[in-house]
């Protein structure tokens, strides 16, 4: 219903557990000739599907969820997925101005660009350590309990590489970032150069009483 309100015509749904031969679903999709094909799966299955779809002459744009967010997608599908769209709660490290030095240090140490969620993992660890420090202080220097650390995490406000993090009473981030991204190159080594198409800042849903 919401798609219709946005002027989007959903031409059909196809489901499969196939991982190698997608002809049974590619044929009817090609006949309908949609503007866009959304694949709700993960990169290894999607890569084979997208590659076969292009080989069968399908010209539609491709899109998928955060299960696409892996350089292995281009390693498997190559040029077939260049220009496709995917959504993720994590953008490439290049979209975060404060993460520039982190990216440089990461590449210097590991000889490659940071993988998806690397900057988020850094922020998570740093926030956790800050919360543990606060829990230690609140416990008078004694070893805090798991519950005390959990409470401290929810109270911690942290200015991270990726965003400013603050939690609500449920433990959810008060605001979450959501990205629409586009694959920039068929080269897996350039996955970190994927383009940010749109960024959404979404508030956490209210606590139901």
Spans of features found by a protein language model:
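Extracytosolic ligand-binding ectodomains
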Residues: 1-209
């Amino acid at each position: 219903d919401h798609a219709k309100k946005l002027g989007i015509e959903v031409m059909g749904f196809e489901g499969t557990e196939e991982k190698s031969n997608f002809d049974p679903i590619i044929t009817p999709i090609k006949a309908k000739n949609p503007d866009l094909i959304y694949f709700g799966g993960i990169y290894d299955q999607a890569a084979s599907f997208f590659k076969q779809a292009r080989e069968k002459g399908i010209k539609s744009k491709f899109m998928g969820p955060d299960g696409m967010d892996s350089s292995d997608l281009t390693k498997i599908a190559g040029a077939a997925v260049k220009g496709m769209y995917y959504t993720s709660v994590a953008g490439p490290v290049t979209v975060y101005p404060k993460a520039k030095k982190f990216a440089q240090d990461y590449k210097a140490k590991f000889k490659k660009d940071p993988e998806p969620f690397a900057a988020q993992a850094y922020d998570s660890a740093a926030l956790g350590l800050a919360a543990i420090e606060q829990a230690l202080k609140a416990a008078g220097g004694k070893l805090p309990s798991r519950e005390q650390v959990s409470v401290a995490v929810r109270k911690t406000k942290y200015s991270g590489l990726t965003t400013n993090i603050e939690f609500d009473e449920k433990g959810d981030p008060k605001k979450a970032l959501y990205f629409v991204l586009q694959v920039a190159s068929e080269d897996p080594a350039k996955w970190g150069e994927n383009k940010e198409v749109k960024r959404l800042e979404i508030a956490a849903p209210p606590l139901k009483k």
